[in-house]
């Protein structure tokens, strides 16, 4: 009599060891009754780690604002301010864009924001990966096979000279693996990922602040280039007035040929200066387009109001103001979070020295059939379930764990040094930016006074020349000095505006970021 027997066996690989589990036979109907609850549990587990991307900014066009607290001797306070994705603006050639509109356009179009946004999303997804380490791993598998054999008979039986057999088997199974306890290693890994995600969000905010500053800087420079062109055009008008006065004196027989040639030379010089000013204006416009992230061939109007900023003295920031600025600068917050993440990596590396407790189990059923030519089919169904708890204790690994701990401590020390350097550099930038603003304010006042005196000198020299008292040389010199004073005043005013924007940038006040309190 031929017999066919199915013996179910599976192998689980857990923490480097192979665990063999033999099946405990159970009735098939009990196995079928357990399948729906198991499937329901699987769907519930799949929904446990699906929202980690919510840690990232919701849009590449707006800075990140989150609600989170990190406790580790120091506290990061965040405020929730949800933002929505804005539509990309269409360039209206008839509209004159002001600075706030240009900043919004840059946040929507500049590729740096989208790059930083994707990096923040990747860091947030990494947090989701670490959270999944706390959940069990359930694997479903189905193994099936078919076998056909033909055996020649020594004697013919009836019309059959061969014995043919067929058999097939189907074995579905569910395997469970769950790490129950690891002395805080997974928790340390998750905390490190959370800090890294926070640092990525701060870097995203830093990119936004830099873009805002770049737009303001290029906007002011473009406005200064426009003002220089206006000043140069005014110089051309003044030189033409001087030429008219020289020609009138020439007709009266008072002016010489040299005076007339000098007046014409002044006009030609003014025309050349106007061409140069126009080129500089176009270059400044392209720099603004680059900061906005729009094509170079874009046609748009930019509204730049006349210089009306009051040049009031600026007091240097107090130590308390500097501390507050450091507590809200994104780069300082990012380096601080990375330093905390590096410390958590030390805890994760040290946990490799400790044992781990895990749970493993399986649930399977088998369906087989055996056919012999000329005989009725033989079918059988088997089922089995298994569950066990195991402990792994690392004994020797050739010093690999010690090297990992030393490496983690080295990275932590390096991250701490980077944080201190970033904080010190930021404080130095704030002091330097305040000094630059003070110097620019003083230069602006002096340049404004210079323009007034140069204008009076030019008017007096021109009137004197018209009445035959002054000389053409004095008038030309006064006109050139007036243009120089006007350009210096434009540059000084622009430096004041850029210096003020730079001070706000280095103090982290371009957006509304989170603040870090208690940092030392």
Predicted regions: what they are:
Residues 49-221, 357, 361, 399-402:
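Short flexible linkers and secondary-structure junctions
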Residues 114-115, 131, 166, 180-208, ...:
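Sec/SRP-type N-terminal targeting helices
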């Amino acid at each position: 009599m031929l017999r066919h027997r199915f013996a179910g066996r599976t192998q689980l690989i857990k923490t480097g060891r192979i665990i063999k589990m033999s099946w405990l036979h159970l009735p098939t109907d009990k196995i079928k009754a357990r399948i729906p609850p198991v499937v329901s549990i699987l769907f519930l587990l799949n929904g446990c780690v699906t929202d980690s991307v919510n840690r990232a900014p919701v849009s590449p066009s707006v800075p990140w604002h989150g609600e989170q607290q990190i406790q580790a001797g120091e506290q990061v306070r965040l405020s929730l301010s949800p933002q929505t994705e804005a539509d990309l603006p269409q360039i209206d050639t008839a509209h004159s864009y002001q600075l706030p509109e240009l900043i919004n356009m840059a946040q929507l179009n500049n590729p740096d924001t989208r790059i930083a946004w994707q990096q923040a999303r990747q860091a947030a997804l990494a947090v989701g990966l670490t959270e999944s380490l706390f959940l069990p791993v359930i694997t479903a598998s189905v193994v099936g096979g078919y076998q056909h054999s033909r055996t020649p008979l020594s004697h013919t039986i009836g019309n059959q000279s061969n014995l043919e057999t067929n058999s097939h088997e189907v074995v579905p199974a569910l395997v469970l693996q769950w790490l129950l306890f690891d002395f805080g290693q997974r928790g340390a890994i998750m905390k490190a990922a959370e800090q890294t995600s926070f640092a990525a969000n701060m870097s995203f905010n830093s990119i936004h602040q830099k873009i805002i500053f770049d737009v303001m800087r290029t906007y002011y420079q473009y406005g200064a280039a426009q003002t220089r062109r206006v000043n140069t055009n005014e110089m051309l008008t003044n030189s033409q007035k001087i030429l008219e006065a020289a020609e009138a004196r020439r007709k009266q027989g008072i002016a010489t040929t040299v005076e007339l040639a000098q007046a014409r030379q002044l006009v030609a010089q003014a025309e050349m200066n106007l061409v140069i000013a126009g080129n500089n204006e176009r270059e400044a416009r392209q720099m603004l387009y680059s900061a906005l992230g729009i094509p170079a061939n874009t046609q748009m109007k930019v509204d730049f109001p006349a210089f009306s900023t009051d040049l009031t003295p600026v007091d240097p920031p107090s130590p308390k103001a500097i501390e507050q600025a450091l507590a809200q600068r994104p780069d300082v917050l990012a380096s601080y979070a990375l330093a905390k993440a590096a410390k958590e990596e030390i805890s994760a590396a040290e946990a490799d020295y400790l044992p781990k407790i895990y749970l493993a189990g399986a649930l399977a059923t088998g369906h087989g059939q055996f056919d012999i030519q000329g005989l009725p089919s033989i079918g059988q169904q088997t089922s089995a379930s298994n569950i066990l708890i195991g402990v792994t204790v690392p004994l020797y690994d050739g010093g690999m764990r010690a090297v990992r701990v030393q490496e983690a401590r080295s990275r932590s020390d390096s991250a701490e040094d980077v944080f201190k350097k970033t904080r010190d550099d930021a404080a130095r930038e704030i002091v330097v930016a305040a000094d630059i603003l003070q110097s620019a304010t003083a230069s602006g006042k002096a340049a404004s006074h210079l323009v007034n005196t140069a204008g009076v000198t030019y008017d007096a020299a021109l009137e004197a020349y018209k009445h035959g008292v002054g000389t053409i040389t004095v008038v030309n010199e006064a006109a050139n000095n007036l243009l120089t004073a006007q350009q210096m005043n434009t540059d000084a005013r622009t430096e004041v505006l850029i210096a003020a924007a730079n001070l706000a940038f280095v103090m982290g006040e371009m957006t509304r970021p989170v603040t870090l309190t208690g940092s030392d």
